[in-house]
Amino acid sequence: SWTRILHPFIGVIMAVSFLAAFLRFRNLNRMTPADREWLSRAREMVDGNDHNMPEQGKYNGGQKMMFWAMSLCVLLLAVSGIFLWRAYFNMPVGIVRLSAVVHAAIAAFMIGIVMVHVYAAIWTKGTIRAMWYGTVTRAWAKQHHRAWYREVTGK
């Protein structure tokens, strides 16, 4: 079927595109002590007590974890996908079978973390607008990403 033929090529496009995004955003997603503290107190955020959360830059600890998890997943998908691409690569049957399991498990895991990400975005008022339009209000930035707000506004 066409999906079976196109899947590997779309995978290459996805991997190359993600590599470009990774190279662009990796420095903004380095974990800091404030991110670790934010993650340890994430329950407060979920409970709506987000006013006393540690100051965050452009991305919070949860967003940074999402970035690194997706980066690792795309890498594993690319490697396992290459092992599965029998039209161009000749791998032993055992490696192909293991790669199929790894590929499917990583894809399922990625779907799960994307679902959590979407749920978290819905949960945090103003986030859907930020993802849809690429902008946030000053008040939202000041409340959720104070360090970034100060960096951008100088206040």
Show which residues each predicted segment covers:
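Membrane-embedded alpha-helical bundles that constitute the cytochrome b-like, heme-associated redox core
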Residues: 1-155
